[in-house]
């Protein structure tokens, strides 16, 4: 019993335009990464409480490391939650 393979249409594919992500902290030097500012750090955490990766946030590697350290410090002194509790 062999299965029949379905071929894809051989027409032209749509080309997607990927917008270049930029580091918000490199472009605007007035924004500082600080563990005491959870309003800024909250933008880099998912709704589940996980730290967003660099490929999604668009920040450079230097600032991503600083963000990670600041988020972990803010979690340890209870400015940010480790895990977000689900509403019942």
From Swiss-Prot:
Keyword rRNA processing on entry: no
Source superkingdom: Bacteria
One GO term (biological process): translation
Stored InterPro entries: Ribosomal_bS18, Ribosomal_bS18_CS, Ribosomal_bS18_sf
Record's GO cellular component terms: cytosolic small ribosomal subunit
GO molecular function: small ribosomal subunit rRNA binding; structural constituent of ribosome
Disulfide bond sites: none
Keyword terms, alphabetized: Ribonucleoprotein, Ribosomal protein, RNA-binding, rRNA-binding
Pfam families: Ribosomal_S18
Cross-referenced PROSITE patterns: RIBOSOMAL_S18 (PS00057)
Family: Belongs to the bacterial ribosomal protein bS18 family.
PANTHER family: 30S RIBOSOMAL PROTEIN S18 (PTHR13479), SMALL RIBOSOMAL SUBUNIT PROTEIN BS18M (PTHR13479:SF40)
Function comment: Binds as a heterodimer with protein bS6 to the central domain of the 16S rRNA, where it helps stabilize the platform of the 30S subunit.
Subunit and interaction comment: Part of the 30S ribosomal subunit. Forms a tight heterodimer with protein bS6.
Name assigned to this protein: Small ribosomal subunit protein bS18
Upper lineage: Bacteria, Pseudomonadati, Thermodesulfobacteriota, Syntrophia, Syntrophales
Gene this protein is translated from: rpsR
